[in-house]
Amino acid sequence: MATGSEFAALFTRDLARLSRQLDAFDDAHLWQVLPGVTNSAGNLMLHLNGNLRAFIGLQIGGVAYGRDRAREFSAKDVPRAEIAADLAGLATLIPEVLAAVTPARWDELFPENVLGTPLSNRHFVIHLYGHLNYHVGQIDYLRRVLSGEGALTRPAT
């Protein structure tokens, strides 16, 4: 079973991937949508910030956060610097919260029934990790289609 430090490492890696996507988008494409595509990359980034702060930061970590889910999908032209600052804060917050979860707490029920069935904290964090990567993949694909550029290179480790 995954521990808090293992979850923290995974979220750290993939929140860095999300920030790299933001850096790779030019301003003209960040809020652009294509036919048949509902959300821009900018809106997906706002959504991931709100989702992870609400479910991991607030519900698991007890860190105050007032989510405005409607704004996550309706806001346009949020300054890049604001999104970058939100993602940088998220990249600090989420691993800290996850690393602090006690082994017994992973088996407790997540405090909110979001998916229609009670889930343990562990199960719900696994769901959130999949959700993060689903949207990071969408963002990457949008960037490639809109810019004509290929995959981002992996950072040196």
Regions found by a protein language model. Give the residues of each.
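Acidic/histidine-rich alpha-helical segments that form the ligand environment
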Residues: A75-E112, S120-L132
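Short, contiguous alpha-helical
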Residues: G4, A8-T12, A16-S19, A28-R71, ...
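Short, flexible helix-adjacent loops and helix caps
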Residues: D23-L30, P103-W106
